[in-house]
Amino acid sequence: MISTMMTSKSKIGMMTKKPEHSGLLVIDKPQGVTSHDVVAAVRGALHMKRVGHAGTLDPMATGVLVVGFGNATRLLNYIVDHNKTYEATIRLGQRTTTDDAEGELLPAGERAVNFPSRQAVEQLITERFTGRIEQVPNVYSAIKVNGQRAYDLAREGKDVELKARPVTIEEFNVRQARYGYTHSDRAGTELAGAVVAERAGDGWIADTAPHEDMQPVMDVTVTCSAGTYIRALARDLGEELGLGGHLTMLRRTRVGRFSVNMPNVMSAHAESKTFTNREGMEVTRNRA
């Protein structure tokens, strides 16, 4: 936590106001809660109203959420514009309405009879998904259309058309490829993936699935500019491979200089709405 104490003088005399607590918290957001939920919990823990965050994470995502309180909220507009790094898992051969595992499955694409080689996938990423690219966000996003959130319009059944936006992909590396089971069988996915990856030896997989219910899965690392949608990358990569694709896991490991590996990262506990440091001590502020 980066914390400061600030005082100010009144216009009448030299009376000093009560010091205002302010600072930044680097929080490891858990899965299943919104960024707004985390902010609300920080307000309760610190007994403060002036709290905000630098860059929304979807409920499915985990990782770095920079939260500012007091005068430090002024810094959030600068922090949100910094580059970000993500670790993600992309499932190929399945499309969803939201481009991630939270959405409903769409009609299946072609079966991945022959999975491309590592060289072919990496060449495609270099040519089409590295540097400055144009990206169309999913309609289930927080982008505003005529003053309304796109996801609100989409949930109301209204037609939403979002324009392509320029983003910059600095790094898009495939760590490994493996086979996993269906969209809903996540436990089976990890087990099967580990077995097949071990057989491959080099972190890649055979060109055919060992079981008809399995689909290819890729673990990737992406460093990108602000405003990049990783689930849109997953969708577009799947389309370029002719298979379709969606995001099944997303973890933000860095926002600017704030990393999930920093010693002062806080763990957020959704049920109790509390925060602890790496030693397990609860973080709060006395009202006095």
Task: Tell me the role of every PLM-derived stretch.
Residues 2-288:
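Catalytic/RNA-binding core of pseudouridine synthases
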